[in-house]
Amino acid sequence: MALWGLPGSAVLAASVFVGGAVSSPLVAADNTGSHTLHSRAETTPSSPTNNPGNGHPEYIAYVLVPVFFVMGLLGVLICHLLKKKGYRCTTEAEQEVEEEKVEKIELNDSINENSDTVGQIVQYIMKNEANADILKAMVADNSVGDIESPVTPSTPGSPPVSPGPLSPGATPGKHVCGHHLHTVGGVVERDVCQRCRHKRWHFIKPTNKTKEGRPRRQGEVTVLSVGRFRVTKVEHKSNQKERRSLMSVSGIESVNGDVPATPVKRERSDTE
């Protein structure tokens, strides 16, 4: 009843205040709901179809293999063009490494097939040239200093043993075979040595340790050198022929030992 006595402005203000208090929780609830929806949307993982950054790693191989293939063909093409222009592309270090690998493989095969440990020791000792030279010098000194020292076919300076007809009571001579190394205590009077009888020892291949470098051609100039890769240029034969012709002409003019005359000297001689 007291409300009817209040002025109209007071009633209007009270109604607005009550309406705002009632509507404010609803707005807050809507805001929190919107925040929760946004947070859920942010926390959900993105699908691989929506994210353009996720790529398949197996497809990278299909791209890299053609790229490397094209690069190799491009290098071969460049070397071919340089060869046509007079250059030459070489990789000398790789050839030396391949030769060393082949020698190591052959040596390992011969050692594995050999079952005599003493023979392996002798082979390792004789592999060094200095040891071989010292051993030969020692054998030569012993054979010269000691008159009664027996002369074996392996000693330097000994005459070759020629097999001759055996007498009825004579013992067979010592077997001489230069295909493999003899161990200590091998001075046994047998016609065939133990190694040749079992046929376990292969022929020794002489190892060429001193490798001569590749002879450089006349007029060859190194243009580019990157590691093992080298590009060299050889002068054309026409330039060499011109030089030879000039040298021959100058040689004909100086047959009597006189120096070939220069154009200035020729003009002076003509004026005189």
Curated annotation (Swiss-Prot):
Region (Disordered): 33-52, 146-171, 235-272
Record carries keyword Endoplasmic reticulum: no
Segments on the Cytoplasmic face: 80-272
Pfam families: RELT (PF12606)
Source domain of life: Eukaryota
GO biological process, alphabetically ordered: positive regulation of p38MAPK cascade
Family that this chain belongs to: Belongs to the RELT family.
Stated name of the protein: RELT-like protein 1
Organism of derivation: Mus musculus
Lineage: Eukaryota, Metazoa, Chordata, Craniata, Vertebrata
Gene: Rell1
